[in-house]
Amino acid sequence: MLRLILAILLRRLLVVIPMLLVVSVMIFVILRLLPVDPIAMIISPTAMPDEVEAMRAFHGLDKPIPMQYLIWIGNILTGDFGNAISFRDSVMNLLGETLPATIELALFALFFAIIIGFGGGLYMFHVRGTVRETVTDVTSIAMLSLADFLWASILMLLVGVHWMLLPISGRYGPEFIAPDITGFIFIDAIITADGALLISSLEHILLPALALALAFAPLIMRVLKSSLTEVMTEDYITLARLRGISERRILLRHALKNGVLPTLTLIGVQFGFLFGGTLLVEIIFSYPGLGNLMVRAIRNTDLPVIQMAALTYCVVVLASNTVVDVLYVVLNPKLRKE
C-alpha cells in the first residue's frame, strides 16, 4: 500500500510542478504588467528621484521582468519569499501569521460541510419517492443559490447582531494573548491547556466556518443522494437483498462504501473553491487570515505579498486534489488492482 501511495504522489508531482511553474509565471507577469507603481504608493510625493530609484532597486523592481521572475523563484526555493513593500515585514512572517488562521477556518468549514452534507444526503436518500423528497430537493437548491458571502452576511446579522449569540469579528477575544507556538490557535490552546482561549476561538470561528459550510454542504447532499441511488441498483445490492440482509445494513455496509467515492472526489475538488471562498468571508468577519492579508495587499499594490498569497492559494488547491487522488485509489479496490 505504501508503495502504491508513493507511486501516486510521484506521478502527481510530475504534473503539479509544471502546473505551479506556469501559474507562477502567469501571476508574476500579470502583476508586473499592471499600470501601477507600488513604490509610488508608499514613498513620499516629495521624495527625490534618486530615493525612488533606491527604493525600486531595494525591492528588485529596477530589473527586467524575466530577471525579476528568476530571482523571485530562486529565492522561493531557498525559503526567501521577499519583503513586503507596505507592511514593513517579510512575506514569510506575514504568511506565517495568516495562513494557519485560514487553514483552520477552511478545515472547520470542511468538517461542518461534511457533517451537514452527509446527514442531509442520507436523509434525502431515505425519503426518496415521497413528498419530503421534493421539499429536501427544493431546500438544497435554495441553499445552493446563496453564495458563501451571502451566508456570512445572513449569519452575522441574524446570529451575531440580532441575537448576539456569537462574536462577529476577530479570531479570539481581545482579553487573550495567543501563544506563538504553531500559529494554529486551537493547537496552541490545547498545548498550553488554555481552555478559555480554546472556547473563545471556537466561538469566533463558528460563524465564518458555518457560512462556508452552508454554501458547500448542498453539493455534498445532492451528489451523495445520486450516488447512493445509483449504487442501490447494482447487482450485488440485489443479491444482498435476496439473502435477506436488511436495507439499513445494505446501505451502511455495502452501498455507502461505494457511493461515497464520487462524493469524496467532489469534496477534494470543491475544497479549493472553499479555501478561495475564505477571502470574502474573512473580510466580512474581520478574520485575520490569508484572504484578509491579500485584500489589504491589493489595496496597497504590495506585489510581493499579492503574488505569494496567490501562489499559496494555488498550492493548497493542488495539494488537496493530490490528497483526494490518493484516498480515491486507497478506497477503491478496482483502482488498487489496476
Language model segments and positions:
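N-terminal signal-anchor/first transmembrane alpha helix
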Residues: 1-62, 92, 96, 123, ...
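Alpha-helical transmembrane segments of integral membrane proteins
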Residues: 2-7, 99-100, 104-132, 180-338
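Generic hydrophobic transmembrane alpha-helix motif, especially the helices
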Residues: 19, 140-210, 214
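Hydrophobic alpha-helical transmembrane segments of multi-pass integral membrane proteins
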Residues: 21-26, 65, 69, 106-111, ...
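Transmembrane helix-loop junctions in multipass membrane proteins, especially transporters and channels
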Residues: 28, 32-36, 40, 125-130, ...
